[in-house]
Design a protein with these regions (language model features):
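Preference for protein termini
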Residues: 1-333
Length: 333
């Protein structure tokens, strides 16, 4: 995979080309100090939170300073969130212009593994603090930053705010991932492959044809690479929306395919794919066991996972000692 292929898939590169067929979005350059804040692995202190004009009696029981037991320990550190006033104003103006609620992401990835930490268990954000909370809690975004010890200086990181669209329950069955090799679709996969949707099996021919037609009319030969992956959403009116573009390779989820078969299955002389109008369409059928969400493992802190799997022996030993001490104390009582 070439570096150009990855760069061509960043949001600001493809969005202007396909803006007509995508969700309305705003792109804001990410200042260096904001990037440093997101990369900081220290204690999570969320910045960008609007100051409350006062303590609400309805929501909280206000307590006077004399009633609070403050620590006199000189070693107690006070964690203060950094502020980014200019950036905060730009973000809030963008959020307001998009209707007050947005879906945030960076150049390539979104914090989809961190939805569980939000109060609404959603990626829906209405303030900068909502965005920071998701970004600081996401392993997916850190992976992008940490994948290369010497990041390309030409890469300008950007905050992408996409207008929030409420999807009806079960609307995930309308999302599909398309794999393109040599400017021809070789495979289409159900995006949410962990669930079975009866609608897909009933409409598979129509879905197959509409995606192929949309690709030929609007995407084919218009994307700078000939090998790539793109995600689409087909709404209830039949209109197709471009959601994202990704590199053709292991950095992108292959869903119901494997990258091995995607790479070797396409051959200009291959009988199965001899005609362009015959990409392989895979979806979860009723005979396949429904699989758990791939993001469930991100709901637990890594320490808990290490304990449960025994991957960190020192943590496990400390835990057993703590448990034994607790039992000894209970027996003494």
């Amino acid at each position: 995979m070439k570096k150009e292929q990855v760069l061509n898939c960043q949001f600001s590169q493809w969005y202007p080309r396909f803006k007509k067929f995508s969700i309305r979005s705003v792109i804001i350059p990410l200042p260096e100090n904001v990037k440093d804040y997101l990369l900081d692995d220290g204690t999570l202190v969320v910045s960008g939170r609007e100051e409350s004009p006062g303590c609400s009696q309805r929501d909280f029981n206000c307590t006077t300073e004399d009633e609070v037991q403050w620590s006199d320990d000189e070693n107690t550190a006070t964690l203060t969130a950094p502020e980014f006033p200019e950036f905060s104003i730009k973000v809030q103006e963008a959020i307001n212009s998009l209707g007050g609620s947005v879906f945030p992401k960076l150049n390539w990835s979104s914090p989809r593994d961190a939805y569980w930490i939000a109060l609404n268990s959603s990626l829906k954000c209405s303030t900068l603090s909502d965005i920071f909370l998701l970004f600081k809690s996401s392993d997916f975004l850190r992976f992008i930053y940490c994948a290369d010890d010497s990041p390309d200086p030409n890469i300008k990181y950007e905050l992408v705010l996409r207008k929030w669209c409420e999807l009806i329950p079960g609307a995930e069955f309308r999302c599909f991932r398309c794999f393109v090799k040599e400017n021809k679709i070789i495979g289409i996969s159900q995006r949410d492959y962990t669930q079975y949707y009866d609608h897909i099996s009933k409409q598979k021919e129509e879905i197959h044809k509409s995606i192929q037609y949309f690709f030929q009319e609007h995407i084919q030969y218009n994307f700078p690479d000939e090998d790539f992956v793109f995600d689409i959403y087909k709404d209830s009116q039949g209109k197709i929306w471009v959601i994202d573009f990704n590199p053709f390779g292991e950095v992108t989820g292959s869903l119901l395919f494997t990258w091995e078969e995607l790479r070797r299955s396409w051959n200009l002389g291959d009988v199965e794919n001899e005609e362009q109008d015959c990409p392989i369409f895979r979806y979860t059928n009723s005979e396949v066991t429904v699989q758990p969400s791939p993001y469930l493992s991100y709901r637990l802190p890594k320490d808990f996972v290490d304990l449960s799997t025994g991957e960190d022996a020192h943590k496990l030993i400390d835990f057993l000692k703590l448990n034994r001490n607790q039992q000894d104390e209970d027996s003494d009582d």
